[in-house]
Regions:
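ABC transporter nucleotide-binding domains
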Residues: 1-129
């Protein structure tokens, strides 16, 4: 079995709180697990209701915020332990595309239209399928 491209193990992110802050804590993500294989040119979509942790997950995967507990591994390397040079290389390979709610939920667009835009713009396919 090959090593996964991205592996998220028991990821938890808690905002707020702190020893002396007196602020309440907010659990934005709790014990989240995801494995993305090493297939070339694949697109993975995370969808969910508002406030379900999608943006927090993206920020954790991209290394923009620190994980409270758990691990995020890219090609077997812990994202939290990467130095600046490794982070720059990592961010060249992993990107988040945030949704445009007006385009995604436009009743005049079919799902195929939305995916075709991504596939064509990033040249992910050689032919129409």
């Amino acid at each position: 079995m090959t090593q996964p491209l991205l592996e998220i193990k028991n990821a938890t992110k808690i905002y707020g709180g702190g020893f002396l802050s007196g602020q309440p804590t907010t659990v934005a993500l709790q014990d989240f697990n995801l494995t993305i294989g090493d297939r070339p040119a694949s697109i993975t979509t995370i969808a969910g209701e508002s406030g379900s942790g999608k943006t927090t997950l993206a920020n954790l995967v991209l290394g923009f915020v620190k994980i409270t507990s758990g691990q995020i591994l890219f090609k077997g390397n812990d994202v939290a332990l990467m130095d600046k040079a490794q982070q720059m290389e990592y961010r060249r390979e992993v990107q988040a595309i945030f949704q445009d709610p007006y385009a995604v939920y436009n009743p005049f667009y079919r799902v195929k239209h939305i995916f075709d835009l991504v596939v064509n713009n990033f040249k992910l396919a050689n032919n129409k399928s």
